[in-house]
């Protein structure tokens, strides 16, 4: 039985990769990588996201200046069709991932009830 669960997990991994929503994220990501300005903006977003996560993990909040930078970056992203499409595709994929997470972790939640 223990090997069987890994088989199911691998099957799920392949099924996620086959989802049209996953394929759309890949497609849009490739388009971003092919566009220098979109790629630079995406890299800036990733760096900002990592910085914010580090701050929050250490109990810090973004300064007013950093919040302004975040808002400016958000506006640039909204104005870029490729990045906007990427985040929309990510959102569509995240619906599946949230549902899968809920299903997979249901037995563990039952253990703490």
Swiss-Prot record:
Pfam families: Com_YlbF (PF06133). Disulfide bonds: none annotated. Gene3D superfamilies: YheA/YmcA-like. Belongs to the UPF0342 family. This is UPF0342 protein MGAS10750_Spy0713. It comes from Streptococcus pyogenes serotype M4 (strain MGAS10750).
